[in-house]
Regions:
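Conserved NTP-binding catalytic cores of kinases and kinase-like/nucleotidyltransferase enzymes
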Residues: 1-106, 198-206, 216-223, 325-336, ...
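ATP/Mg2+ or Mg2+-diphosphate-binding catalytic cores
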Residues: 2-4, 13-14, 175-176, 288-345
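An alpha-helical support segment within catalytic cores of ATP-dependent transferases
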Residues: 17-33, 37, 145-213, 219
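ATP-binding pocket architecture of kinase catalytic cores
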Residues: 39-163, 174-186
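Catalytic activation segment of kinase domains across protein kinase-like and atypical kinase folds
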Residues: 214-240
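Active-site activation/catalytic loop segments of kinase-like enzymes and analogous catalytic loops
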Residues: 237-270, 280-302, 309-324
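Short, solvent-exposed segments of well-ordered alpha helices
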Residues: 249, 274, 278, 336-340, ...
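C-terminal amphipathic alpha-helical interaction region
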Residues: 343-368, 372, 377-464
Length: 464
């Protein structure tokens, strides 16, 4: 069964259970439009998606059905992504063949293309080099698509140079401003800094993927570009900034080298200062979109994952501002943990959740997420008093008023940011970065890739 709510763009957003009714709709659509369904399996993750095997005229074929996120984001509905996907396919971009769009679910039905993500897993440096060349070619082809086609699908066409720079960012900001949220001094500080420092675009607007660099490959062949829900018309430097975010875990360890490769393969020259600015805006994109969901959790949304996204993204945004300002941010030293009388209750719940009997991959996914959330709450219990005391004291030093709680401190800090001039930027940056690091350290165990991602400073971009 489903529910709907009104989104800021007037589209109906799915926000609740994806159940058997939806699977039957998917099955019936595929059997009507493609062929008899041999198997249909729900993917083990929060976003509704299915792996489907179909009997075709030339034998079995594999399909992938991708549902909507739910909630209030992204800014445009899944039907928009279907139109963009079709345009990309018609324009020669290497995408999975799209069979159609199931409006009732909603969902995209496409070929399941062989391949895997993460270029760091390429078998050799020679394979990696060929894959990067193909990615540069695909990005250039996307940037060369007539923007009018994407505007016709539902995007806006920015005209004024600063509007071009902010095109994609304003989409996410609109969701944030229209929604109900918790006090967010970190987001408010970055928003204000971006508005004060936005550079005018140096190129005409073009088609951009925004969440760029998502692809799968097999051997030395890029088999498909993926995920077009954020495609819009704007500044191409936004796409290059997205690759910087992929440096941490997806093998893009030389973004500057890729920018030169893009130019060598026919793309326009890349301006590093514009990439730096766009990376700050790109990093804020996700926190802007999920602020409402963090304040109001919904079923079928991965709350723990959203906390991780917020922490990583805000860390990158603040460290990007520090890079632009020439400010060196200090490492955060964790306080000593303090075990409370309530911790055993959370530990008991974790043991209980870990022992749950499972029926399928999706049930296993939900069980594992419950366990992760309970582990997070255990860390909250160990550090919350020390973290709160540190944060309240730091905010009081800035504002001159001592809050009674963390939430009150955040409200005071947000009000201070609204009135503060640029002379306070460095002090605010340090306080907010320390708070984001506290949030981040609650989400990851030492020795994990996540802990490394959250504790490793953003690598500066070099112009040479």
């Amino acid at each position: 069964m489903t529910e709907t709510e009104t989104r800021s763009d007037g589209a109906a957003a799915r926000t609740s259970l994806i159940g058997e009714e939806d699977e039957w709709i998917v099955r019936e659509w595929i059997e009507r439009e493609v062929g008899p369904v041999l198997s249909l399996e729900r993917e083990g993750r929060w976003r509704p998606a299915w792996f489907v095997e179909v009997q075709g005229n030339d034998g079995p074929k594999r399909l992938f059905v991708r549902g909507a996120r739910g909630g209030r984001w992204p800014a445009r509905p899944l039907s928009y992504e279907a139109k963009v996907h079709r345009i990309f396919e018609e324009q020669g971009i290497k995408v999975p063949h799209l069979y159609g769009f199931i409006e009732e679910v909603p969902a995209l039905v496409m070929d399941r293309v062989p391949g895997r993500p993460n270029i760091s897993t390429a078998a050799s440096e020679a394979d990696r080099k060929k894959l990067l060349e193909q990615l540069a070619d695909q990005m250039r082809l996307i940037h060369e698509i007539d923007p009018a086609l994407i505007v016709e699908a539902g995007a806006t066409m920015p005209v004024e140079p600063k509007a071009i720079t902010f095109s994609a960012y304003r989409d996410a900001e609109g969701l944030y401003l229209d929604g109900d949220r918790r006090p967010s001094p970190d987001i408010e500080f970055v928003r204000k800094w971006l508005d004060r420092n936005v550079p005018p675009a140096i190129y005409d607007p073009c088609v951009i993927a925004m969440d760029a660099g998502q692809f799968i490959f097999k051997g030395d062949e890029l088999t498909a570009m993926l995920d077009f829900e954020l495609v819009c018309v704007g500044d191409r430097h936004a796409d290059f900034s997205a690759l910087r975010s992929r440096e941490r875990v997806e093998g893009f360890d030389d973004p500057e080298g890729f920018y030169k490769l893009y130019e060598q393969r026919g793309g326009t020259p890349v301006d590093i200062d514009h990439v730096r600015f766009q990376h700050i805006a790109f990093s804020l994109y996700t926190p802007l979109q999920i602020a409402n969901d963090l304040a109001h959790p919904r079923d079928q949304e991965d709350y723990h994952e959203y906390l991780i996204w917020h922490a990583i993204s805000m860390k990158d945004a603040l460290e990007g501002i520090a890079e632009s300002m020439g400010v060196a941010l200090a490492a955060y030293e964790m306080p000593a943990p303090a075990r409370t009388q309530y911790l055993a209750s959370v530990e008991a719940l974790e043991v209980m959740a870990a022992s749950l009997t499972l029926s399928d991959d999706f049930a296993a996914y939900r069980r594992d997420k419950i366990v992760l959330a309970l582990q997070y709450l255990q860390k909250v219990e160990l550090y919350r008093d020390a973290f709160a005391a540190e944060y309240i004291s730091e905010v009081a030093e800035l504002t001159g008023t001592r809050a009674a709680s963390e939430e009150e401190a955040s409200r005071q800090l947000e009000a201070f940011i609204a009135m503060a001039g640029p002379e306070h930027d460095e002090a605010l940056l340090r306080v907010l970065h320390r708070q984001v690091k506290r949030q981040a350290m609650l989400l990851a165990d030492e020795g994990t890739w996540l802990h490394q991602s959250l504790s490793t400073p953003l690598r500066p971009l070099n112009k040479d």
